[in-house]
Amino acid sequence: MAVPFRRTGKTAKRKRRTHYKLDNPALVVCKQTNNFTLSHRVTKNSGYYKGRLLLENNKIVKKVA
């Protein structure tokens, strides 16, 4: 079985690990409630998406294809 010829140094190991990081979610402001929400999703508080009411009391008001 193959083994590494040299030990991986601290700097090389840390440079490789810099890519394992979390990204901030893309938040946008809802026009109806002025709350932050995830982009391309229905606002949980108001039920609006792209200025149209889609949810009311957690029930689907209008289906969008």
Swiss-Prot record:
GO MF annotations, alphabetized: structural constituent of ribosome
Family designation: Belongs to the bacterial ribosomal protein bL32 family.
Name by which UniProt lists this protein: Large ribosomal subunit protein bL32
Protein keywords: Ribonucleoprotein, Ribosomal protein
GO biological process: translation
Gene Ontology CC terms: large ribosomal subunit
Listed PANTHER family: 50S RIBOSOMAL PROTEIN L32, LARGE RIBOSOMAL SUBUNIT PROTEIN BL32
